């Protein structure tokens, strides 16, 4: 109990010192600070900026990276001090919230040490990524399919859209310098159920297969087409 109280007292003193700092000089980003906050650093990449900032809870700038292009939806600080971030890359094929398209890694000095473009006519990275314990990267993509693809999987023609955006999650093995190899992937497109045509694959009663995705369940994508999607 004494240790807990002492720790709380130290946090309170630290927070008070930060408050004095906030009034004494300009800081980067800190608007509110309480004794309940931990002492971890904060990494953020403003949506309209090409800079990424590492600050302490007092708002003091610890480090800054200058990069090219608007950031995607995330930035991560690696154990060795590298910055891993996503970047917006438009191809004109996919337009939606959370769009990314490029994953890049910078060392502490701001040198680009690795990047990968995951954006084409048929697929596009969006939203978050995750670094696995083995160093590989999980990324979430949109895949583009068309009316005939959906109908061939049992979707009713009256429900079929011109484009169908389907989620795919991929595990990427980064190559030296740039690029990656897909070593694993998963998509709901491979786990469908439909009850419209017994001659087509994945026929059955959706109620009997709750682990599968009903191809006739409608979700509207940002483009106005239908989609089987997931945002991280």
Where are these regions (language model features)?
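Histidine-/acidic-rich catalytic cores in large beta-rich domains
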Residues: 24-232
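Bacterial N-terminal signal peptides
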Residues: 8-21
